[in-house]
């Protein structure tokens, strides 16, 4: 593995990136809440934390993942989808004394109703119904999808055994992981509208249930007349079991700064509210604006091979990004390393990363993040090599389908490979545009 380092760089935490906590923790010390994590919602940078990687019982904040996967599958089509309540949705909760909306076996429920019931009423039967929906079968299939998403996000301290959060020894997460789960969920179509709704929701009678059901959010921080009200909190999810105690995760915004804050194992309900105020007051007084830092502060050349022969080199660089820095810190307090393999083999996923390290000292959490680096010059390299024959690429490891197609070269010329790569790059850009459109659609 090659390493290239620069003293001036940027910090970026993407979904799936790995964070390594620094030695010194910035931020308030909480006595009545076991763990917390304050994160920049835009970049994923951890701003302050306490025991953020400790594995704890999440209770109903589990439903952030459940709702996120349901929104991802629906792609904004909430009104035309109806779900049928199964026997397991209802009777698997028998004896748990858990929150529910009295769904009945065989009841036909619009997806939109199941979403708001799960978010606002914290309905465990609603969460079961959604798990069957995005899992494509049983509740267990939904739980498997939840854990698959955890793996895709690269989260090391989370495992789910149910979609609702009833405490179980094999059901746990951490404040850092939960903040990242919410950050991912906020990118799914419609999730932010769901997560931030304050108005009462009305569920009309169904084919079996003649009663109209009403859901209202119960977070006192978001109730204007409450002594615990905080203007900056836009959306939230609460959790409680005897084992987990009180958990809380929220999205907050003030003067253009968007934060995610997760707390776990608050001893009392009042601790949950008071500690959240302490954390947000600290965060918004410390981090007031973003600093835009350019990319390309460190670059390196990476050898490219395909069909058993060397094709040349491409350029790898770190991306540019905006980040929140505490007063007294600047880009000079951040370093970047590029991690590269000895060569990039066509047909395999390019394993190129930028590792950014912030030395926050006493002012800010010291962290490192590992993200995908940018590769440029691949198409140009192949164009320059037109006419060179590639031998059968027996040494190519399977990667993503797009890159695998780029590496298939038996009996082909590099000219054909150029066309393939260019087509795939257009396809990739279209996918990115669709993802961007979905991201902006949430507002």
Give short role names for the model-derived ranges:
Residues 15-16, 76, 206, 291:
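Residues in and immediately flanking transmembrane alpha helices
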Residues 155-156, 169-172, 176-413, 421, ...:
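Domain-terminus/edge residues, biased toward the C-terminal soluble/receptor-binding domains
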């Amino acid at each position: 593995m090659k390493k290239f380092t620069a003293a001036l760089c940027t910090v970026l935490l993407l979904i799936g990136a790995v964070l390594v906590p620094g030695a010194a923790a910035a931020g308030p010390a909480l006595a009545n809440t076991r763990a917390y994590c304050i994160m920049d919602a835009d970049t994923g940078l951890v701003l302050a934390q306490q025991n953020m990687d400790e594995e704890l019982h999440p209770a109903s904040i589990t439903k952030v993942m459940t709702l996120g996967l349901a929104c991802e599958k629906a792609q904004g089509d909430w009104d035309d989808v109806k779900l049928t309540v199964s026997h397991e949705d209802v009777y698997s909760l028998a004896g748990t004394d858990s929150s529910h909306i009295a769904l009945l076996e065989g009841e036909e429920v619009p997806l939109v109703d199941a979403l708001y019931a799960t978010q606002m009423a914290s309905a465990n039967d609603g969460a079961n119904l959604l798990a069957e929906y995005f899992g494509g079968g049983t509740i267990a299939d939904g739980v498997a999808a939840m854990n698959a998403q955890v793996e895709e996000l690269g989260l090391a301290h989370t495992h789910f055994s149910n979609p609702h959060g009833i405490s179980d020894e094999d059901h746990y997460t951490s404040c850092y992981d939960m903040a990242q789960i919410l950050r991912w969920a906020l990118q799914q179509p419609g999730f932010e509208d769901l997560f931030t709704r304050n108005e009462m929701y009305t569920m009309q009678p169904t084919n079996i249930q003649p009663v109209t059901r009403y859901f209202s959010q119960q977070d006192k921080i978001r109730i204007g007349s409450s002594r615990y009200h905080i203007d900056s909190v836009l959306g939230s999810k609460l959790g409680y079991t005897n084992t987990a105690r009180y958990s809380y995760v929220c999205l907050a915004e003030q003067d253009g700064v968007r934060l995610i804050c997760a707390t776990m194992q608050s001893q009392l309900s009042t601790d949950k509210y008071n500690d959240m105020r302490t954390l947000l007051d600290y965060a918004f007084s410390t981090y007031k604006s973003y600093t835009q830092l350019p990319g390309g502060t460190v670059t390196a050349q990476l050898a490219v091979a395909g069909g058993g022969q060397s094709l040349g080199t491409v350029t790898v660089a770190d991306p540019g990004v905006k980040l929140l820095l505490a007063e007294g810190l600047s880009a000079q307090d951040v370093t970047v390393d590029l991690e590269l393999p000895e060569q990039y083999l066509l047909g395999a996923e390019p394993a190129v990363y930028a590792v950014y390290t912030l030395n926050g000292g006493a002012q800010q959490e010291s962290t490192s993040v590992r993200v995908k680096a940018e590769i440029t010059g691949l198409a140009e390299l192949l164009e320059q090599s037109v006419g060179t024959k590639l031998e059968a690429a027996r040494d190519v490891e399977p990667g993503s389908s797009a890159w695998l197609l780029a590496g298939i070269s038996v009996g082909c010329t590099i000219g054909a490979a150029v066309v393939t790569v260019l087509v795939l790059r257009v396809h990739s850009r279209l996918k990115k545009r669709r993802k961007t459109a979905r991201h902006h659609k949430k507002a």
